[in-house]
Amino acid sequence: MKVVFFHRKQADGNFSIEALFQQVRNSLPDDIDPKMCEMLFYSRGFFRRLFCCLQAFFSQGEVNHVTGDIHFVTLFLRRNKTVLTIHDLGFMEGKSGLSYFILKWFWIVWPAKHCKVITVISEATKNELIRYVPGSASKIKVIYNPVSDLFRPLAKQFNKTRPVILQIGTKHNKNIDRLLQAVKGLPCVVYFLGKLERKQVQLLNQFSISYKEYINLSTEEVVELYRSCDVVSFVSTVEGFGLPIVEANAVGRAVVTSNISSMPEVAGGSAHLVDPFDVQSIRVGIQKILDDDAYREQLIKNGFENAKRFDIKQIADQYAGVYRKLSAQ
């Protein structure tokens, strides 16, 4: 069975979707022949997107899988043979007027109606999608993101004197301003995976917080960053999934994350949950992990069990089941 995976044209430093489905393709059963179709053009402007749609139309397989971001190409594929993955709907945040209309209809409503199966990466994303497309629940299947097998347990002596807090991501939803207010005055170092904005650097200097910035790392380098830290921070205001929670679980690091969106679902009792809009709540959570050795070790133990839910073989088998069902129709 030939399954064609349709990917956006990859931009520098933006490779999460591609890495995810490369893992899936590598782990699919032998009866599935996966092919990748990367768009020749970036998803920018009407004519480039139209060319992407035409490329998709002429590249179809027995089953088609639109893997995210370029949802609109679904409109040019055979409806009964197409799977659409929607990772999150955060791109709708703050939109209004014409941009809201275009995103709603060409990225959500019409693509959702013009495919046989929609896969989403969390129950939170499923519930949000249903609000935009009432009546779509029957075609939505939740398939979690897998954790790479590069993330393996590595014991580390916890640094009680000067712990390293690893913050994954620096975009607006990552809630950096409140995190910095929360760790102000704590004897720690903050590692940031992602490029810091000028305002964030100013706050770091204003609060006299020691930090290091890491950008454009390979997967292997990211793994080493997890291994080098003592605590992982992921107190986002919204997330479609939250893979860093599971990556930290798999390595064996305690996590503080948010009590909203998909994060409690992904954490599954393996992280300390905080209110991301409350600086004091974030500070208390971090302080609890730093100070309470028994609590921290229990979170780590829970994390190892939680990570088992995101094994790549299980995830690939779930996708394979979807492909077989569509192929048989």
Residue ranges: model-predicted function:
Residues 98-118:
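Membrane-proximal helix-turn-helix segments that form the acceptor-binding/catalytic region
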Residues 2-74, 211:
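Active-site donor-binding segments of glycosyltransferases and PAPS-dependent sulfotransferases
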Residues 257, 272-279, 287-293:
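Conserved acidic donor-binding segment of nucleotide-sugar-dependent glycosyltransferases
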